[in-house]
Amino acid sequence: MKLAYYPGCSGQGTSAEYERSTRAVCRALEIGLKEISDWSCCGSTPAHACDHVLSSALSARNLALAAAEGAERVGTPCPSCLANLKTAKYRMQDEAFRDKVNALLDNPCPEELPETVSILQVLVEDYGTGAIAEKVKKPLEGIKVACYYGCLMSRPADIMQFDDAENPMAMDNIMTALGAEVVPFPLKTECSRDTAARLTGRILERAQAFGADAVVVACPLCHMNLDLRQRQAVGGSMKMPVLYFTQLMGLALGLPHQELGFEKLCVSPDELLRKIDAAQAAKAAAAKADEATEEAKA
C-alpha cells in the first residue's frame, strides 16, 4: 500500500514524536509514505480564521503538488491539516471560489484534486484492525486507556466523512486490537481548547475517574493541551500519561522505544511501560507454570 504523505508543520517540531512513530508504524506494516515534494504549511487555524480563500489556497497548493506527482490520495496524521485539506477541496467544488483560489496561486489547480485521509483512517479502513492484531508482538495487556479524539477528526461530518462524529471508535478499535482495555469516555470529542484550561482539566479528571492509565490521542494540539499543560489544567500533579496512538501501536508491534519518541513526552510514560512489562512477565510465568504442570502429569 502506498500513499502520498503530508507531514504537517507540527510534525517537524512540537509533535516530532507523532511524526516519528507514524513513520515507524507505517514501515512496520509496509504502508509506503511518499512525502509530497516542496509541501508547505496548510495555514492551520490562523489562516481560515482570517480568510477562507487564503486558507484554501495554502491547502490547494499542496493537493495540486500531490496531483502533479500522480497521487490519488493524500494521507496526513494531523486532524487540523486533514480538516484544512479536505475543506479546501470541498469549497473548490464551487467554480467562483475556485477562481479566487487560483488567482492566488502561481499555477492553477486541476479540477480533480486528490482525496485526503487521516493515517488513522488508513489504518482502520484500509489495513484493518484484524490485520493489525495479527502483527502484535507485545500485547498491551494490563493497561486501561481513554481514547480522546478532540473536535476535528470527524467533524464536520459532511466534509470529514470518517467515523461517527459524536462517538468515534477508530482508536478504540485499534487499542482493543493491540490488547489494551478501552474505558468508556463520554468526553472523547469535546474540544480541549479553553482559556482557563477548565475543559482540559475536566477531560483528564474524567479519564482518571474511569480508571484509565493513559489518554490516547491523534491530534498534536490535543496532545499539547493534555500533556504539556496538564499541571496547569488540573491545578497540580496528576501524572496522567498522554500518548499518540501510533506510539502505543509501535510498542505493541515490538518496535524500539527510540523510534517512538517516548522521551519527548512531558508526563513520563515509564510507569505505564512498566505495567505493560509486568503483565507480559506474569503471562509468561503463568504459561511456564502451566507447562510444568502438564509435564508433571505426563
Describe these PLM feature segments:
Residues 1-298:
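Iron-sulfur cluster-binding electron-transfer modules in prokaryotic oxidoreductases
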